[in-house]
Amino acid sequence: METKNALFKKIVKISDQLLNKISIKKLTKDKKNNLFVYFDEFVDVTIIDELHQLSKTTLMHDLQIWYINNLKEVDHKKILTFFKKISEQNANLIFLEQINDLNTKIEYNSNLNSLILKINDKLIYDHFIANKLEILNILKVWSLPYSNFEIHFENLSSLLNEKHEQAVNEIISHHIQQQKHLEQQISQQQNFYNNQKANFNYYKNPSNKTITKLIDINPLMNNAKIRAYVFLKKIDILKSGAIAYKLNVIDDSETLTIMTYLPSGEHPLKKFLDELKIDQLIEAEIDIVLDNMSKSGQVPIGKIKKICCVEDKHVKKQITPRLELNFHTKMSSLDAIISTQELIDFAVKNQLKTIGITDRNVVQAYPEIAKFSKKQDLKIIYGLETEELEDQIPLVLNVRDQNLDNATYVIFDIETTGLFPNFDEIIEFGAVIMQNNKQIGEKIQFFIKPIQQINENVTNLTNISQEMVNNAIDEKTALLKIKEIFDDHILVAHNGINFDINFINQRLLKWGLEPLKNPSIDTLMISRAINPFKSHRLGAICKKYEVDYNDESAHRADYDAIVLADVFKVMKNNLFNDFGITNLSEINTKLQTTMLKNRSFGNWINLYIKNQANVKDMYELVSISHTDMYYTRPTITTSFLANKKDKLIISNSIHESDLINALYSKNDEEIKRLIQRYDFITLPSLGSQKHLVYAKKITIENVQKAFKKLIYLALELNKIIIYSSSPYYFFKDDKKFYDVYVNTKGLEGKAHRFANEVYVPDLEYIDQKNAIDELAYLEDEKLINLIINENPVHINSWFDDSIQPLKEGLYAPKMEGVDQKTIDYVYHTAKKIYGENLPTIVEQRIKKELNSIIKHGFSVVYWISHLLVEKSMQDGYGVGSRGSVGSSLVATFLNITDVNPLTPHYLCPNCKKCEFITNADDGFDLAPKSCEQCQTPMLTDGHNIPFETFLGFDGDKVPDIDLNFSGVYQAVAHNFIKSIFGETHSYRAGTIGTMAQTSAENTVKKYFENRFNENKIIRDSTVSLYVQKCIDSKRTTGQHPGGIIIVPKEYSIWDFSPYNFPANDINETWKTTHFAFEYLHDSLLKFDILGHDNPTILKLLKDYTGIDERDVPMYDPLVMKSFSDISALNIKPSDVLNETTGAISIPEFGTRFVRGMLVDTKPKSFADLIRISGLSHGESVWLGNAQSLIKSGKLLKDVIACRDDIMTYLIRQNVEPKTAFLIMEDVRKGKKIKPEHQIILKELKVPEWYIESANKIKYMFPKAHATAYVMHAWKFAWYKIYYPLEYYAAFFSVRADNFDLFVINQGKEFIEKTYNDIEQRSKSRDPQKKVSSRELALQPIYEIVIELLARGFKISNISIEQSQATSYVIDKENNAIIPPFIAIQGLGETVANSIIEARNQKVFSTIEDLKNRTKISRTDLKNLRVLGVLDHLSETEQLTLF
């Protein structure tokens, strides 16, 4: 019998020498072509490595080999060698090479097949925990199929002698430099580091080792020396404090990722890497390892051993500047790779003194271009490339009064040698003559002999060869014959207007013959106007009209003419039946349909702003093109354009241009007519026409002839002509990035305009020298100089030098008497609360705020916000404030916010005695007490928030009043604003949706997948290079969730911005600003009317309980306890997934992240909750900052939590208020404290740790916002404790459609099992265990349900008799809540309402009755059956007799 070893040799090309080193116990193969090789004895890592290499030479196709070591009788310390090997080939597991018998004890549990690791090194322990599953999976690949790891952190030092302890300490101090291979190397390199100077250049004299091109770096190499430019630098701070540096570098062949890890603290290489800039040229010696995070696992990356800087800047090729008027930026939707900042930098660096921008259809780059060019010696010419549509799109030429029924038609087609009659010829004519829907005579067909030879492309398309036309008549004779056939009849052709009729006319003129004057019907245009088809090719129309069409016979003139005759019969009938068209003269007027305009191709033009006054005209034009004249894309009519003739400069575009197309297809007189339309002529680069050349539609020589004609005709007409390459990217090499756009479908699945071209035109910036070289075909240096240099200078003088696209200063709307109304209302409310004699603190604060508000014209914002809140409250919906508005006491007294920013205080509601407690953290933490004067229980309030955080230190910052309305009420609030200011003065704040990092990565990866086969390995560094070019490219427009922009009545929106529909959806009721609101923030006021679930839930709670949220007590020890202790709910952690807090489902505190913060901080007061809210919403405020400080012993009240804390704390430290404010502003914006301010702080003994903490912060939350959030959270917690059923019913009612009754109906144990399964799979990297987005969304719902059940309540099943459409029903009798119908997945609100309406009329008697009287679907019915909801109903009313 054949041995297993011998059998294995038949499968793999293995040498006898290697085969003798292994003993195979078993070979098994599964259905998925996996071969499992089981060894008798333990096989070490070097042999496994050799076997892995041999596995690639398997003799069996697609066989995957898995080696399985014998784990039973082996010293498991041997796996250390496997750890070393894994660390060499997996960069993010490099810490494994630090594991040794000094820091790790290894044991094996054979019963569980589990490896037990006892680690005394915290960093290794942390890394192992974080990467446990990945290591387990990789070990299986390396023949070690452990089922699990048990990992323990233990102090092993007592087991070691002094020498070993010293070795351990040395490893601990160095192991996070994970790129070192041996302990000796670590020691040597550490000594080397210490000897370097502060301006460390990792090795000053690069070694003589040969430079390896990046494309040649491969996994089989151990190390290499590279020279490359840095194009991406990423720095990550690990939990351990170590720093991971990743550099993506590029040379002229490829890209590569190189990386290193450094310990926290000072390190010579750290300074070098921190200061390393993008575009610097570096040399590095690297060890080459595999990037195990890559998809293939075969991508090499480099571990930096040595590195130095060779050049400070990436020196790109020098260019000679040329004025270019048609730069395109990333605001041309998915169509350019030039960012606005890059454009300005490019212009400045290359000494372009003037640049023009003409993004396609939009002017959204204007604000950034103006911003970035402001301090540069650079003139901007603001332009636009857009599409012009004729006011009446012709479907019939040479219209006459002719009844369609009694007319005679010649239905014809021609075949030609190409598309362009100026360079191509007719080679076949076919026709049929039709009258009264019947063919007259025989079909007509004849060939025409061209002067030029018929090439292979033409033969392939038309099935006409040169041999077939050799004996045919010449073209002039043929044209005379065609005219005779046409007589005075009506002509019918498919695409006749743009091709057949024009082609014949141009060839007639070529031969000195009169052009056609016959009425001509274009069936392609009619189909576009009347047929809702996607394709209007003749074959596609035949299929829809049920006309026979043979693709093999198509594209021959006679066949196409016969088929078209049948199509025209159907079409003519439809014109009468659907449009009442009986006369030829009616077609053009009655068929100007939206479908026609959606499908017609217009003329692309470039428009430019001459002076400041014309900015408004451009904005009007852009607005109209995006709204009134939007036909699947922005367009503008010829007549509208004519009205702007004296206000905007107009030139032709280089693509899809009537003028450029006319050079190929029209006669000189027509070309002259078109030239006269333009203020100047744009001569395209030859490269811009290469798509036509490569498709063999025209030769480059003929393009040159056409361009010469354009130049000489323009000169003849005294029109200035200038050269343009219309750049979409800077350099020729950048075209590969542009190719991503060309091969990526845009929004709504629309293909890029060049997607079907065999060659994408060249659209880089062509500098002066190369432009001159290109125009050498003119053979006239003076003329070339005129076009390249002199004319652009002349045109430049037409434009003002200082056009500003944005207005400066605030333009607030005016309302008569609004200042006095505000003053009166504020004092009325203040005195109502605090008494006629206002406390000094209150009086001073009101005066201070009102002075600023009225002085800067902000009263109207406050007053309208007050009216909005008042209306919402009257309609039964509370409003929550966001942002810093709670910093304003005036806002409090106008009822805009519930937050009181005063110093914490007691207030007697009876006698108005007010007592301010200056040393208290928060008014809601003041212990209850009675008034000393009248014994009435005193109220408490005041959160100690400075006004400066809202309107700035001088009170002149434009106010952002953000209000949270109920989601169901938001639209009402929006329309309330519109009713006050009017539709033409109220706009939604616009947003611009750009390609984000993840989207760009997916797009680029898909591009590579489509371009290359799956065996082609694309490095992640290459993907990142492409991503960098694509990221931030505009995809679409949108609208701020609630921002409403107000334009003063004395102005037009066009004084500030164009407008459009969000995402160009013409069905939207609101228009948005074309510019993103961030650029209008300082000139126009915005009301943030946001939709939120919280006000909706609180409204439901009021309906359920009868208790208004305003009556919820804000001091309650049990509520306070619930934030950190689940026992406040009378349950234990073990009852709810080991949760220790009672904060599940509490807004802003219910997420797993914030619940973890609650555990860490153990809040004891309302002030603590505000701090936690601030910490959780900031960036780099908690993690790696406050969290560490608290763990080191600092109290929660000591750390920086909210931005206001900085100002108030520093003022207490005797910092001058303005300086404290400025420091706060720097810190909250992510800027470090200025050196001069740090000196002041240190002089005033502000702790160093405080300064360091502030300097880590990237963004800070305002205290007023945090306070508003906490107030809502507190109310939720109160209802949750005292009205639990009502609370859960309200909470789930707002989220009723995000529910899985199939899981929930099976009880607590099953829900917990489902939750844990999602949890485990979410941590797995196995694609088979991928968690769906719905499962992730349901996980927090399961938490809440488990808590509800643990508290002794129930969720009943859906009830046909009791369930409501969208809200939960409270069943007190059964201590339960009953879900609504929309809790069933897929059952929408419309269906749910139909069930309620039918039930209100009559109870459902049977399932059939339910089905007949509601809109319920088959799937809904099935789900109801599975849930057992219909068990008590019979199927039908029929009786069973037996």
Swiss-Prot record:
It comes from the Bacteria. One of its GO terms (cellular component) is cytoplasm. Signal peptide: none annotated. It catalyses: DNA(n) + a 2'-deoxyribonucleoside 5'-triphosphate = DNA(n+1) + diphosphate. Its EC number is 2.7.7.7. Transmembrane segments: none annotated. Pfam families: DNA_pol3_alpha, DNA_pol3_finger, HHH_6, PHP, RNase_T. Residues 409-568 form the Exonuclease domain. It is found in: Cytoplasm. Its main location: cytoplasm. Keywords: Cytoplasm, DNA replication, DNA-directed DNA polymerase, Exonuclease, Hydrolase, Nuclease, Nucleotidyltransferase, Transferase. SUPFAM superfamilies: AF1531-like (SSF160975), PHP domain-like (SSF89550), Ribonuclease H-like (SSF53098). GO terms for molecular function: 3'-5' exonuclease activity; DNA binding; DNA-directed DNA polymerase activity. GO terms for biological process: DNA-templated DNA replication. Required for replicative DNA synthesis. This DNA polymerase also exhibits 3' to 5' exonuclease activity. Belongs to the DNA polymerase type-C family. PolC subfamily. This is DNA polymerase III PolC-type. It comes from Ureaplasma parvum serovar 3 (strain ATCC 700970). The gene is polC.
